């Protein structure tokens, strides 16, 4: 041993504390993979140099709760590390750039160029900015494609992060791709290009694809990175100054981290959308694409200067291959072409027979992990099953990104841009998130009600359905009160006439939509992080995000309803599907709801990436 090497010294010190054996594999200083380093500034940092990596006996002094204490003591949040706030700021800048850009997509694609304008801008408060004049179906189709593409690419970003580059470096590469996409969007909107609609839409589409690659790689990795900065993994007892004994619960801390992470997302969203909508109206679309690009440059800047302070989990090679092999082994002898027989065979304890302890010395060479990692994989797959209902939730949410913006244009605007009204959604979130975190959730815990993630998500589906009821009713009265009946968009484009109903009537839709996101969307981030294996967090997060992409694909089937006079039926169908999702989600997951504490407190797992090396041999070397 080299006594001058601090990482080796820490490892020896840790090895003398038997009670820390469960933490050794995770907290061991990783060696830097020279082949993967893109620059010395963003290499993987040894865990012993990272803020939050414990190297003393603090854990030995903690008192862990008994089953009785888990049931009876009040649960509180732990302290959030400052590094999490820097990651949240990076997300704020990224969301400003993304939503500031996408906020003007509908008008850019759908509406015609105002008379006398070369940039799409208009000073006439009764007119709507526009550029390419491709209609509502085209704008709905392209915005749905953008949503689909941006949420399918996280799977690729997760694969690269978990197996090869790690989360930090994958984020940096993704930022570079997104910046390139933003620049191409700026080019598509400059006057010399926008005057040729076919060339502009081609340029716009290329920028959309490249930006989606960057957005996807960023999204699947930034949310696990922010929660990983909090290092506590198990609940422990703390005595407050008042003498009250409480449980510091990591699950509640992660819940708070994601609540305020989502708060910063929406601060970035609302500032980006509001400012860029006015830039679109008074200057032109090119400025609405250029300013978000400038702010996006803060993302790599902050990450670069904080790079040595972040806790980073080292990628562990072919972890996906290991998980697939494990599942394939568990399925051995269970396959059947008869669906009923297949279901019955898989109703038995699925994972117990393929645990290393059950296989004994005959276990395969590739099985370089312990029983606890098998439990983590099983838990992660259960989380993915939970997310399967989410497309029906996102189908309702996605109405705010396209059809409801078009609906606003056909209402009495009173000088307000039609694509600024949907900012009531992030505004509602900014107001409601602190209320839920400081009042509603603690109040429910104080009353003894365990508002688990499964219960919260179910409520999210119900509230989303209620928001779509409001959208259906409003669209019905637009047709009833409008000067052209059920041809509201034709009436607006040809005659500049609109329904006398105030656009602020839409507020109820966006407020209910925001509350539904607190219950369902934020909880999905929390659930993906807490239920995934530690070396597969990006991919489980990507599965949660992929449900949005799948929802966008389903939404393409409803594009035919995204036009007059069928819009009432469009919102009605989405309403029904949201309530069906709520019922189906609860019926398929209520048993999982009862195991929440058990799943959150699985024993620490051990995993080695070295193929052909048994776990026993790996432990002996330590």
What are these regions (language model features)?
Residues 1-26, 33:
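PEST-like, low-complexity acidic/proline-rich intrinsically disordered segments
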Residues 2-5, 30-33, 38-124, 130-236, ...:
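Hydrophobic transmembrane alpha-helices of multi-pass solute transporters/permeases
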